[in-house]
Amino acid sequence: MAVTHSLGFPRIGAGRELKRAVEACWAGRTGPAELAQTGRELRERHWMIQSGSGIDLVPVGDFAWYDQMLNMTALLGAVPRRFGFQADALSLDQYFQLARGNAEQPAMEMTKWFDTNYHYIVPEFDRETGFGPGTEWLFDEVEEAKALRLNPKPVLIGPLTYLHLGKERQAGFSRLELLPRLLPAYAAILRRLHASGVPWVQMDEPILGMDLPPEWLEAFAPAYAALAEAGPKLLLATYFASVAEHAVWLKSSAVAGLHIDAVRAPEQVADFLKDFPADKVLSLGLIDGRNVWRTDLRRALEQAESAGAVLGERLWLAPSCSLLHVPQDLSLETSLNPEIKDWLAFAVQKLEELAVIDKGLRLGRQAVAAELAERDRLLQTRAQSPLIHDPGVKRRLEGLSDADFRRHSPFAERSPLQRERLRLPPFPTTTIGSFPQTPKIRAARAAHRRGELNGDAYRDAMRAAIREAVYKQESLGLDLLVHGEAERNDMVEYFGERLAGYAFTKHGWVQSYGSRCVKPPIIYGDVARPEPMTVEWIGYAQSLTKKPVKGMLTGPVTMLQWSFARDDQPRAVTALQIALAIRDEVADLEAAGVAAIQIDEPAFREGLPLKAADRADYLDWAVKAFRLASCGVADDTQIHTHMCYSEFGDILPAIAELDADVITIETCRSAMDLLEAFGAFGYPNDIGPGVYDIHSPRVPAGAEIRALLEKAAAAVDPERLWVNPDCGLKTRQWPEAEQALANMVEAARAMRRAESLAGSAA
């Protein structure tokens, strides 16, 4: 009989209880005790859901107040010394300061978790980094699960992944050198778990799906040989990509079990089944943990049956990865189109699907014949549904030519025309788009959605917010303004709601970072734009000022990456469909007199496949999608794009191929290190490195911002530098945003004065 288990479960709660509790604690409305109680209640609820669905081993340690990688840093006692915190006495408040910064120290860096829209807090390493006793949270949670008479399976980020995803804060050494110091800390954790009666521990090593240098690969076998002696049986878990090239040595390694992703890489199953050792278990991830479509149960059961014929009771069944990446429960969606709802499965439903596969494997197909027949019917209904197909969209794609994917003139010819039209000073200042979403703004949007605020009253409320944003920007002295995005609940959801082919949930929340949750739309069919989406708001903002106002759009790659995309056609085709819709909006904005249009692509890099061999194809269609969206404008219309949380060094040629006139990037948490790559590459167009971290409430001093600008000016031609925050200001409060922007504007003016003096001296 197969063992069923889960690699992780959504932690925020079906009603975003964790978000609300954390933010109440941050605001001082509640204390750590109340927050801790909410955490206990959520953990118990989620464990019981999983156990009630038939999961034999429930994950413990997948819960985190902010981030699971940050939890590992706290557990390992690897808290950066710059904060001055005692690792084994770390309070919740101090834990949050690591992620959010404080008056003395900026936050730890944050970046994307592989190719997902989840963000993790990056560990910091130097030669003196120590590992030792840390927080007790994991051990406490194990005891909580045992008290509920559950079978806990602790989940740890494995040591190689933990080190690899960290960052050196000191030149001249490799973080891999810390492995001999790190392994004893892991071994101590494993011994404690073993002493508490835990039989299995899941060790997540998703970096095995990447192209790793030889020294990193060679470190795995001896590392796990050492850890296997600590007591519990180790299940080494991989996901997001194939690890077939490592099958031979993984099967001979010291771990007691392996988990592989059979959704993203079903072909690798055969490599692992061949000569699979008799003393190990193999866990197959048969249910997609990354997307929301119902599983083809018949095909998944066939996979399980084939593996079971080889492995017998050594077969384990699981989702492909943690269910953190999907919403919690589809049953809460009472207003979703019933036909579309029938095609979907969220975390709870995915565990139910796993139970069907397990039952079919144990009792035979006849025991689940009704479930298989019903699923076959739903899959066929979806494939034939008229909701999916739009012949007009397909005709437009077929009619595209090379001219649709390029600007009229090269950047060197466009740039002077844009400068003349926009009349911007050196080191022009701007923001990334959104301004603080005040309770008043949110209340107006919510009332309008509920039908309690009519269209005229809603328009008046949004216009009032736009007026305030424009007034504040003019008062601060910003050069290129934005309208503030008061009307937008989310940069993807807002546009998706106005596009055909998208569906929306009421409760489909997933965690993005910390307390930040997003509700990704669902792309179920061909995408088209029925009518203009932003022209009214941008045009109104421009009517209030003589300064230029940027149009603000979300790019096609991000619209795809931050949605649950349809799985019945190539992602490249869906991206081009979205690009055509954005292209139409760009044309309408330009016709309305908008001189600068920003097409945000913060998710551009996150779509990059983990393996280099697969990347050229992705970059080809991703670049084409952006260019299709942006290249229909005149030379004197300035196209901006924004990217964040990214390591760009390996994709700079593709970023240059986007041919955006201005790119703004998030660089502050990495102290402008990213900009050096742009400088070394010789990035040809304008660039705006983020000069302060908007994810932290900390307000940087003007001198601090100027120091970053001076560092930027040493890496990139100052004539091509823009000055802007790291990202949008939606989650900040107005007082801190205004002070930070005032300091930013003053730093830009100081740079202009310095450049002017330098020019005079020359």
From Swiss-Prot:
Its EC number is 2.1.1.14. Belongs to the vitamin-B12 independent methionine synthase family. The lineage of its organism: Bacteria, Pseudomonadati, Pseudomonadota, Gammaproteobacteria, Methylococcales. It comes from the Bacteria. Binds 1 zinc ion per subunit. GO terms for biological process: methionine biosynthetic process; methylation. This is 5-methyltetrahydropteroyltriglutamate--homocysteine methyltransferase. Pathway: Amino-acid biosynthesis; L-methionine biosynthesis via de novo pathway; L-methionine from L-homocysteine (MetE route): step 1/1. It comes from Methylococcus capsulatus (strain ATCC 33009 / NCIMB 11132 / Bath). The active site is at H695 (proton donor). The gene is metE. Gene3D superfamilies: 3.20.20.210. L-homocysteine binds at I432, G433, S434, E485, D600. CDD domains: CIMS_C_terminal_like (cd03311), CIMS_N_terminal_like (cd03312). It is an enzyme of class 2 (transferase). 5-methyltetrahydropteroyltri-L-glutamate binds at R16, E17, L18, K19, K112, R516, C517, W562, E606. L-methionine binds at I432, G433, S434, E485, D600. The keyword Repeat applies. Pfam families: Meth_synt_1, Meth_synt_2. It catalyses: 5-methyltetrahydropteroyltri-L-glutamate + L-homocysteine = tetrahydropteroyltri-L-glutamate + L-methionine. Catalyzes the transfer of a methyl group from 5-methyltetrahydrofolate to homocysteine resulting in methionine formation. Its cofactor is Zn(2+). Zn(2+) binds at H642, C644, E666, C727. One of its GO terms (molecular function) is 5-methyltetrahydropteroyltriglutamate-homocysteine S-methyltransferase activity. Keywords: Amino-acid biosynthesis, Metal-binding, Methionine biosynthesis, Methyltransferase, Repeat, Transferase, Zinc.
